[in-house]
């Protein structure tokens, strides 16, 4: 049986404490992984899997990554949803007696990332936790970005709403009690990249959670946080705190607030809406480019970019808060010099939030603190700029402005600028900070001069002109003499090393000097590390002030950026109120107009309310611009609710509580859902959750099934939205079912619109203008021709269309080319009935035969004749079931 080595025994003891993590074990210049960890990591990192003790009967799988490049590999493991424990050597190997002591110095999980290179600058990185009631129908959700100290909680009344909120928050990691079953969470890793981490049920205990929160915030109770009675939210927040403290292995004093919120305070745009409106991700560009945030984000700081994203995820429903933002944007938009100065100063500021987070958790470097200092040095000028502004939001920012000059000053006086990347080599602390340190620095610095003088002296004393005095980290200080001069070596020289062409020696004098210098160097490094640790602690005590300042910087950055966008693209300041109106003049799509040549985007007006124009049925061919008009209306409403100016010449927007979209059609293979099932589930979600305050965007309903079924469903959905709670719901309904225009006859608040086109010399001209009335034709063949279908296909399609429009079934065309050889030509072949409402003739015969002409007055006969004529001409009349059944065949 193989004996376990001391090193492997140490590894196993440490690994036992972190069974759910990949343990990176420092050995010299590498981090090594063993056993199952090695197998997992080698696959994820695409590195070689080897083995330890190859001569042994039992080989131990092993892989490793270079120490200097470890962060990149760690980032890949964490991105794959893995928990990583970093085990470092915590004593100098040269001083170790036996095995070098090692300890886990940090644990990194998907939701607990602090290193800047492992984080997207303008994206939050949330760790979330969910607790549930005994019945499992009420939930508490808490989430924390440890890198920025953002800590929030909410209580939710249904499983469906919980999933909706989780998708909106988009955490990287979700903590769940291992005592409960969570079938609703099973698809989260696959569909949304959320890593699930089971946690002991005791971590979700209400009393334990409250004690943990009270202890962390150093308060007597949680009443001041406004979370009294939110037991489920407190349990979730307590679980996050316990998990963070167990894994970060450091202080988290920068987390100073826990903010509760209510879903009812914000507009909800569900997952389909976020995707279809391309708020954060463009389907065309497959990334941020081409999305709404890509157009709006002119922020200059990382924390400003994150706050703008938060505004878009949580649009406001409070008019006072909306107006507060909008007035600040208006003031900056009207003052170009001030806006330019503000944006210029903001561009010099680093990510203060995350620098503060790293410092508070004890992971900041000298470069981090110098970056913090340089950022804070811009705050006095920003504060002076704010003094000239008068809008309520900006005046409040100025009143609470903190220059943090004392923090910047202490860093300035303590650290050299620029500093080295780390502390290992020293050279970090400024002269004058410590007399003792200055003494050791002089000793280290003067060593080179002493060596040069000593070399001159030894050459003179020995007569060896080629004698050299040198130093390296392995052998220390030495005298090197070539083999040709060995006969001249004095007796007080002691041989230290033999080379091919020379010998290296040491003297008592050189040995004494070496001891003094090395001790001085060691003392210098120890002192520098202690002074830096003291500086870290001093700055950490100001974490709350720094966090508050970062939040104000982000706020100023957001309103300045939106003011810049408003001026650059000629946006207007919308009127926002509690009415049910949406009135837009010259509305534009903010993204599409950006990518079109100047002046080529066609603006459109839109008028909606719940009294006159509530359901707008929009018809017209593909490529006419229906989808653009629908999406731009939703985006303008959304932008109004974050306080932004909007792309229009005028806009009046009544508060909207939800925006729903049903756009496009595609399979959802990941969930095993067909195109039609996806369409119907999205439509069902709209019908179940929309309110009279909602805005609904429907871009085709019923395309994924047969024409009859599709039209029937679309018709019923439109009726339901019109009639809902007698008020109805504001709806933009684009469709190719021209039959839906008949709804305007039976529903008073349905209005027909079409996107104007003209046909000229068999070409179709798109005007992209929304006009009243339904479209008379779909122009599908012309669009197909523009798409490049062969002329023989589009020509044949025109023939068939003419036959259908004349009420005749199409006849098969004679085959051409090889298909015709050996077959007798037939002038025409029988077709099938294809018109949607075309009836078989039996119903007309039956109706005429049923007339009692002998007992009918002339007037009654005319009335019956007129009724038959209308039924023949009409397309929406209802026939007997037997006739309809035959018509479908």
Swiss-Prot record:
Transmembrane segments: none annotated. It comes from the Bacteria. Residues 812-831 are annotated as: Disordered. Keywords: ATP-binding, DNA damage, DNA repair, DNA-binding, Nucleotide-binding. One of its GO terms (molecular function) is ATP-dependent DNA damage sensor activity. ATP binds at residues 620-627. GO terms for cellular component: cytosol. Pfam families: MutS_I, MutS_II, MutS_III, MutS_IV, MutS_V. One of its GO terms (biological process) is mismatch repair. This protein is involved in the repair of mismatches in DNA. It is possible that it carries out the mismatch recognition step. This protein has a weak ATPase activity. Belongs to the DNA mismatch repair MutS family. This is DNA mismatch repair protein MutS. It comes from Syntrophobacter fumaroxidans (strain DSM 10017 / MPOB). The gene is mutS.
